Amino acid sequence: MLSPKRVKFRKQHRGRMKGISTRGNQICSGKFAPQALEPAWITSRQIEAGRRAISRYARRGGKIWIRIFPDKPVTMRPAETRMGSGKGSPEFWVSVVKPNRILYEIGGVPEDIAKAAIRIAAYKMPIRTQFIILHL
C-alpha cells in the first residue's frame, strides 16, 4: 500500500474539500482514465484495490499509472477512551480527491478492455467516476 516514506509532521488537520481540482485533471501518460465526479478521501487500501482490479483485468497487456497519492494522515482515538489527552495516533493515509481529478491512467489496451477494467476499479472507490478518453 502507498504511504509517504517520511513526513515533516505526523498529524494534520482534517481540512475541507472546496471547489474542483485544477491540477491533475488532464490525461498525461495513458489513453483512458477514470475521473472523479465527487469530493472524497480515498484511502491507500482503496487505491491499491483499484490498481489490482485494473491490472488483473488487463492481464499482461498495457500499463497503469496511479495519479493520486495518499499523503494525508488520518488519526483515530482508541475505542472507549475518555475525552482529552491529545489527538489520536495516525491510523491510515488518505488522498484528498476533488471533482475532475484523474485517479488512474491506462495505456496499451483496447478501449473495451480499458472501460471494463476501469468500471471494476470504480466499484472499489467511494465516489462516482466517469470514463474519459484522450483525444489528440
Curated annotation (Swiss-Prot):
UniProt cross-references to Pfam families, sorted A to Z: Ribosomal_L16
GO molecular function: rRNA binding; structural constituent of ribosome
InterPro entries tied to this protein: Ribosomal_uL16, Ribosomal_uL16_bact-type, Ribosomal_uL16_CS, Ribosomal_uL16_dom, Ribosomal_uL16_sf
Database matches in Gene3D superfamilies: Ribosomal protein L10e/L16 (3.90.1170.10)
Subcellular location(s) per record: Plastid, Chloroplast
Extent of Basic residues compositional bias: 1-17
Keyword check for Plastid: yes
Keywords: Chloroplast, Plastid, Ribonucleoprotein, Ribosomal protein
Database matches in PANTHER family: 50S/60S RIBOSOMAL PROTEIN L16, LARGE RIBOSOMAL SUBUNIT PROTEIN UL16M
Quaternary assembly: Part of the 50S ribosomal subunit.
Protein name (database record): Large ribosomal subunit protein uL16c
Taxonomic lineage: Eukaryota, Viridiplantae, Streptophyta, Embryophyta, Anthocerotophyta
Originating gene: rpl16
